[in-house]
């Protein structure tokens, strides 16, 4: 609930931090990968690690020692993360735990004077989204969701093109998370799988789109959501569920517990969103059918079109009927190459790092904190993109009725016209 003295945090900036002191909660697969990434980033000091499974904590500490870094303090147990967040020598807490613990950990961290960087999605319910917003506004701490797809080179190029007017007035965008994860869902956790995993459990109990942010984040940035426009309402529809059951029958037998398991989540979810200014957004989710990986990333405007999947494609007037190919496509990509790609992305290639998106996101986050700049993604992004999980489920369960999307800025979106990232480098 908003207090009388509470104001928005659009454009929030803090004094520069010469050295950013980090702590990590959660050292499973994703958490360890994040920790290892930050060994490549200048201007950071890893102060503390927390993991409920002590074996994972010991392995993470060993990684740092073997890389030549001081061993950070370790915390474990059900309340270890709280004790770590209560320290006064930490600037930024990374939260790489299961979905259901993201919000309470972020809220506690901010209440104890820490900036937070949360793995996706930042929250699972609208109530949790409001908790993140209210806490960030009351504490004046940064709250960033780690949506790495916003730093994809093609996404950044199309963002730059949109900001320079190359697409004309943008009327429609599309995003998705389409990724065949069936083999992972049924693999044992010791082999990196999701068998008996919280993510699989969610698909048994819920429908809608549980993982909207990879597709939604980049296209919301292109539309300048909550910076002159906002998402107004959505309608959502899910197909029947068949993919998980068929896979289980084939691999475990028709009478196996895996094949008899019921899932509420349909194979394909499609969610349509309209903004206050009348622009449309389509977001899809499908992780259980045999098809190539795709996030779509489609941009449609009055002067041109772009789409990353299945192959990068850009078409501009006066020849928009045919996509640019070969050298012509390379030239337009180079012409509109985003400064983040030109700097941090080039550095990632030079150092032969495995994931350019992650490296650019990491460098950019630390760069902003060390230079006292607003972050590229704020708490309103985290709330707006994450709330689609619950709202899409509400729509699906009620015959695809329209569901209103909250204005987490409480009207401040009308007054903020800062172009995303364009004024921050």
Swiss-Prot record:
Substrate binds at residues 177, 211-214, 293. Glycosidase. InterPro entries: Gfo/Idh/MocA-like_OxRdtase_N, Gfo/Idh/MocA_oxidrdct_glycsds, Glyco_hydro_109_C, NAD(P)-bd_dom_sf. SUPFAM superfamilies: NAD(P)-binding Rossmann-fold domains. It comes from Bacteroides fragilis (strain YCH46). Keywords: Glycosidase, Hydrolase, NAD. Binds 1 NAD(+) per subunit. The NAD(+) cannot dissociate. Belongs to the Gfo/Idh/MocA family. Glycosyl hydrolase 109 subfamily. Its cofactor is NAD(+). It comes from the Bacteria. Its EC number is 3.2.1.-. This is Glycosyl hydrolase family 109 protein 2.
């Amino acid at each position: 609930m908003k207090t009388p003295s509470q104001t928005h945090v659009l454009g929030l900036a803090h004094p520069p931090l010469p050295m950013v002191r980090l702590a990590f909660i959660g050292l499973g697969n994703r958490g360890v990968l994040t920790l290892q990434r930050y060994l490549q980033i200048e201007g950071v000091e890893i102060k503390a690690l927390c993991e409920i499974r002590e074996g994972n904590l010991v392995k993470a500490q060993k990684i740092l020692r073997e890389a030549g870094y001081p061993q950070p303090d370790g915390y474990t147990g059900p309340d270890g993360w709280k004790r770590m967040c209560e320290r006064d020598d930490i600037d930024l807490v990374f939260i790489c735990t299961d979905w259901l613990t993201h919000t309470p950990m972020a809220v506690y961290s901010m209440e104890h004077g820490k900036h937070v960087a949360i793995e996706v999605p930042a929250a699972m319910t609208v109530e949790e989204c409001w908790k993140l917003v209210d806490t960030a506004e009351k504490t004046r701490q940064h709250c960033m969701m780690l949506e790495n797809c916003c730093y994809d080179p093609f996404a950044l190029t199309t963002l730059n093109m949109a900001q320079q007017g190359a697409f004309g007035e943008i009327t429609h965008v599309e995003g998705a998370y389409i990724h065949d994860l069936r083999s992972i869902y049924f693999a044992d956790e010791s082999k990196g799988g999701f068998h008996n995993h919280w993510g699989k459990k969610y698909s048994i109990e819920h429908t809608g789109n549980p993982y909207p942010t990879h597709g939604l984040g980049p296209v919301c940035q292109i539309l300048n959501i909550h910076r002159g426009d906002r998402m107004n309402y959505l309608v959502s529809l899910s197909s029947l569920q068949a993919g998980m059951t068929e896979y289980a029958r084939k691999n475990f037998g028709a009478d196996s517990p895996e094949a008899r398991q019921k899932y509420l989540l349909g194979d394909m979810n499609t969610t349509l969103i309209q903004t206050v200014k009348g622009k449309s957004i389509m977001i899809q989710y499908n992780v259980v059918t045999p098809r190539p990986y795709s996030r779509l990333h489609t941009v449609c405007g009055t002067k041109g079109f772009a789409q990353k999947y299945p192959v990068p494609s850009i078409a501009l007037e006066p020849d928009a009927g045919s996509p640019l190919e070969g050298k012509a496509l390379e030239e337009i990509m180079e012409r509109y190459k985003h400064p983040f790609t030109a700097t941090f992305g080039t550095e990632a290639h030079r150092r032969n790092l495995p994931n350019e998106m992650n490296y650019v996101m990491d460098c950019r986050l630390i760069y902003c904190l060390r230079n006292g700049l607003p972050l590229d993604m704020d708490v309103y992004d985290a709330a707006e993109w994450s709330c689609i999980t619950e709202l899409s489920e509400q729509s699906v369960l009620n015959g695809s009725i329209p569901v209103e999307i909250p204005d987490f800025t409480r009207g401040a979106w009308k007054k903020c016209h800062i172009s995303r990232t364009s004024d921050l480098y």
